[in-house]
A protein has these predicted regions:
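A conserved acidic beta->alpha catalytic loop
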Residues: 58-67
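Conserved catalytic core of nucleotide-sugar-dependent glycosyltransferases
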Residues: 97-98, 108, 112-196, 200, ...
Length: 290
């Protein structure tokens, strides 16, 4: 392992550090062409316990931000920082933002509403597993006899395993992870960043690869949500998420195989751990089509 590839420091910080920064998290939300929905979500997430700050990654290049309106309708209990981007890149959200002061990052897509109790519970789980991605949307990879990998949902059957659902990734569009992984992401090979820019996709798959590669463990811990909603239909912009594109799943499988070639390995590992607020942990056939 090269010096630049070392694991980020995931140990608990000494007590001299700000207690707020240790016991709270920063919400990072990247947005494109959904201003009305953004304001609704910002209002919702203001009431989340342990939230330290919100960073909005503004990918609407050349469009006016709603920052003035947001501030005018204040004061708000949690500060919101708008970060204007010069290009609409998927990986903009994985920058090392100077405003990020907490070890815990909560990343949420700009069409996703997660309940306060789900987030409070998931944050408590992340505090027990700070070196893994703790989130609400599991996915998996499967290998074919020819050695080609495919990307699929939680229900996709995994060759070689008996009954029981398996997952090998937890998507970062609704998840907690350690801020140190942002630094690690920036140190990935140029070919990895180029792949994300080429497809405008797969930055979340890359994050699962690098976490699994550097921990030797499954990249994620799946927390079964009680109340998580996709609000895409409520926006007035008419903009549909990229997962609606016909080529979306094909691109995801394409990325898996390209990443295996770049890293010369498949680091993803399967897990069947499902952590629920009504039982901890729960090993079950949980089928949730999200």
């Amino acid at each position: 392992m090269s010096k630049d590839d070392k694991m980020p420091n995931l140990r608990r910080e000494p007590k001299s550090q700000s207690q707020s920064a240790l016991d709270s998290f920063t919400l990072v939300m990247q947005t494109y062409n959904r201003t009305d929905l953004l304001l609704k979500l910002l209002n919702h997430y203001q009431a989340i316990p342990h939230l330290h700050k919100v960073i909005v990654v503004w990918n609407n290049v050349g469009e006016k931000m709603p920052e003035e309106m947001w501030n005018y309708l204040g004061p708000h209990p949690v500060p919101v920082v708008f970060k204007v981007q010069t290009m609409n890149h998927m990986r903009n959200r994985l920058q090392i933002f100077p405003e990020l002061e907490t070890k815990a990052v909560l990343m949420v897509d700009d069409d996703t509403l997660i309940s306060a109790y789900d987030l409070a519970f998931a944050f408590s789980v992340w505090q027990q597993f700070p070196d893994q991605i703790v989130g609400f949307v599991p996915r998996k990879h499967v290998s074919t006899p020819s050695g080609i990998y495919s990307y699929g949902s939680f229900e996709l059957q995994t060759p070689g395993f008996g009954n029981g659902d398996q997952y090998s990734m937890v998507l970062i569009g609704a998840a907690f992870f350690h801020s140190g992984y942002l630094e690690l992401f920036q140190k990935q090979p140029d070919a990895v960043h180029a792949l994300i820019d080429e497809t405008q996709n797969c930055d979340d798959i890359v994050m699962n690869f690098l976490v699994a590669k550097h921990t030797g463990k499954p990249s994620g811990v799946f927390v079964k949500p009680v109340d998580i909603r996709n609000l895409e239909k409520e926006t007035n912009s008419g903009y549909s998420g990229m997962w609606h594109r016909a080529e979306h799943l094909l691109q995801r499988s394409y990325c898996l195989n390209k990443l295996v070639n770049i890293y010369d390995s498949m680091p993803l590992k399967y897990s069947n751990i499902i952590i629920s607020q009504f039982g901890f942990p729960n090993y079950a056939n949980y089928k949730n089509k999200m």
